[in-house]
Amino acid sequence: MNHIQEAFLNTLKVERNFSEHTLKSYQDDLIQFNQFLEQEHLQLNTFEYRDARNYLSYLYSNHLKRTSVSRKISTLRTFYEYWMTLDENIINPFVQLVHPKKEKYLPQFFYEEEMEALFKTVEEDTSKSLRDRVILELLYATGIRVSELVNIKKQDIDFYANGVTVFGKGSKERFVPFGAYCRQSIENYLEHFKPIQSCNHDFLIVNMKGEAITERGVRYVLNDIVKRTAGVSEIHPHKLRHTFATHLLNQGADLRTVQSLLGHVNLSTTGKYTHVSNQQLRKVYLNAHPRAKKENET
C-alpha cells in the first residue's frame, strides 16, 4: 500500500476508533484493489468512473456475495473521500457507482436456555473461568462491541451506578448499565484473578499473562467456551450483541432505549432486531388469542 492508504487506515484507527477487525477488512479491501490496479495497469490517482464499473464487474466475477461487494465498494468510496480532503485534484470515481444492494438477513441470536448453558460452562472454580465469565457477562449484560470491551479501563466501571462507560465508533462516549450477575462477576474477577492484580496498566480484561486482551483473544475465549458447551455450535461477539438486543425487545423494551444502549446513531440500524422479536410476538399471539388456532390445531 502507498502512504496515502496507510494514512487513511491510521485516520480510521485514531480519529474514528475503528476496531482492529474492521481495520483489517479495510486493509484487505485496499490490497485487493491495488492488485486490480496492477493487473490492469491503472494508476490510483487517474482511476475513473468507467474503471470503477470494471472493478465492480471484476468483484462479481470472483463470485463474492453482494454483502462483500457492497463493503468493498464502500471502503473505496470512503478512501477517495478522504484523499479528496488532502488533494483538490483528486476525484471520487466511486461516488456515482450504483451501490449493490445488501442481502437481507436476520441477526443470529441465542435463546435464553442457550445462554444459561454457556454460563454454566464458566462456573468452574478456576482462575481462567473467572476471566472467561466476566467477558461473557459483560458482552451479554451490556451488548457492547468487542472493540469497546477490550478498551474498558478499571476506572470505567461504576459500582455505585452499576454500569460501565464505553467509547464506541467515532469515540462517542455512552454509559451502559449492568445487572447483579454482571456486577458480581466483575467483583470476583478483580478480587481473585491474580494476573489482573499484578499488571502495570488500567485495562479491565487481561489475558493469562496480565496483558490487555485483544479482540482476537476475546474470540478465542468465546470459541473455547462453545467447544465445552453441549448444544451450542457457534458463537461470535456480535451474536451476543444481537442476543442482548433481541432479549430486551422480547421482554418489552422500546426500540429507542435499545438504540441508546447499543450506541446506534440511526434507529433503522436497531430496527433489524424487530424482525427477530416478531417471532416472539407471533408465539405469544398464537398462545394467547382465543381464535388464533382452530380446535384441531396444536
Swiss-Prot record:
Q: List the Pfam families.
A: Phage_int_SAM_1, Phage_integrase
What highest taxon heads this organism's lineage?
Answer: Bacteria
| Catalytic site | 145, 169, 238, 241, 264, 273
Any GO BP annotation: DNA transposition
Query: Looking at the UniProt record for this protein, which Gene Ontology cellular component terms does it annotate, in alphabetical order?
Result: cytoplasm
Tyr recombinase domain mapped to chain residues: 105-286
Where does it reside? Cytoplasm
Q: Does the keyword DNA-binding apply?
A: yes
Q: Please give the Gene Ontology molecular function terms for this protein.
A: DNA binding; tyrosine-based site-specific recombinase activity
Task: List each copy of the Core-binding (CB) domain by range.
Answer: 1-84
Record flagged with keyword Transcription: no
Keywords from the UniProt entry: Cell cycle, Cell division, Chromosome partition, Cytoplasm, DNA integration, DNA recombination, DNA-binding
InterPro entries, from UniProt?
A: CB, DNA_brk_join_enz, Integrase-like_cat_sf, Integrase_catalytic, Integrase_recombinase_N, Integrase_SAM-like_N, Recomb_XerC, Tyrosine_recombinase_XerC/XerD
Among HAMAP family, the record links this protein to:
Recomb_XerC_XerD
**What protein family does this chain belong to?**
Belongs to the 'phage' integrase family. XerC subfamily.
Q: Which PANTHER family match?
A: PHAGE INTEGRASE-RELATED (PTHR30349), TYROSINE RECOMBINASE XERC (PTHR30349:SF77)
This protein's name: Tyrosine recombinase XerC
Organism per entry: Staphylococcus aureus (strain bovine RF122 / ET3-1)
Encoding gene, per UniProt annotation? xerC
